[in-house]
Design a protein with these regions (language model features):
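Short S/T/G/P-rich N-terminal loop/turn motif that feeds into the first structured element of a domain
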Residues: 1-50, 58-68
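C-terminal structural segments of small proteins and small subunits
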Residues: 58-84
Length: 84
């Protein structure tokens, strides 16, 4: 099992919930992702990250497949690159 964890600082913190929904939208659409968890900063601290993503995959090969998955690249990465 491999855990892939990413923390994001958004350009506009008000988009945290939208980012959360986009990240969670991978459930059922990215087959190699066994588990997806998303958290949003509730402290509203400038030092905190705004959103975090934790994805569990089977192994290193599955992680590569996840990172190259068309939905992950086309929808999720595109949105996150525009907002971070």
């Amino acid at each position: 099992m491999v855990k892939h964890i990413v923390c994001f600082k958004l350009k506009d913190r008000k988009k945290s919930e939208e980012a959360k929904e986009i990240l969670l939208s991978m459930r059922g659409k990215v087959p190699t992702a066994q588990e997806i968890e998303v958290g949003v900063d509730f402290l509203d601290s400038a030092r905190s990250y705004d959103v975090f993503l934790s994805v569990t995959v089977r192994d290193g090969k599955a992680l590569t497949e996840y990172q190259n998955d068309p939905y992950h690249v086309g929808v999720v990465k595109k949105f996150m690159h525009e907002e971070t």
